[in-house]
Amino acid sequence: MACCAPRCCSVRTGPATTICSSDKFCRCGVCLPSTCPHDISLLQPTCCDNSPVPCYVPDTYVPTCFLLNSSHPTPGLSGINLTTFIQPGCENVCEPRC
């Protein structure tokens, strides 16, 4: 994930799309995993921008990752509107290319 193209997001729309949310706002582009290794995973966004200032500072918050269209219940999420999209020119999943 560290070699993702700047400002490209690896989130794919569809039944396998994952959403990772937190109480922190990442000001630059992030790459999110397109699949979850477990039903519920604790993940944090990976910033893919080559920004001089880190857009994410580790904290004690607990991010949540869940698989859309899965039968597994999502913990503590209600009344949240989520929209996923693929940025122009970023149709392919980010792949390490070092």
UniProtKB/Swiss-Prot annotation:
Region (3 X 5 AA repeats of C-C-X(3)): 3-59
Residue numbers of N-acetylalanine PTMs: 2
Tissue specificity comment: Localized to the cortical keratogenous zone in wool follicle.
GO CC annotation: cytosol; keratin filament
Lineage: superkingdom: Eukaryota
InterPro entries in the cross-refs: Keratin_matx
Keyword tags: Acetylation, Keratin, Repeat
Positions of Sequence repeats: 3-7, 8-12, 47-51
Molecular function GO terms recorded: structural molecule activity
Function recorded in the entry: In the hair cortex, hair keratin intermediate filaments are embedded in an interfilamentous matrix, consisting of hair keratin-associated proteins (KRTAP), which are essential for the formation of a rigid and resistant hair shaft through their extensive disulfide bond cross-linking with abundant cysteine residues of hair keratins. The matrix proteins include the high-sulfur and high-glycine-tyrosine keratins.
Cross-referenced PANTHER family: KERATIN ASSOCIATED PROTEIN 3-3-RELATED, KERATIN-ASSOCIATED PROTEIN 3-1
Subunit record text: Interacts with hair keratins.
Family per similarity comment: Belongs to the KRTAP type 3 family.
Name this polypeptide is given: Keratin-associated protein 3-2
Source species of the chain: Ovis aries
Taxon lineage: Eukaryota, Metazoa, Chordata, Craniata, Vertebrata
Gene (UniProt): KAP3.2
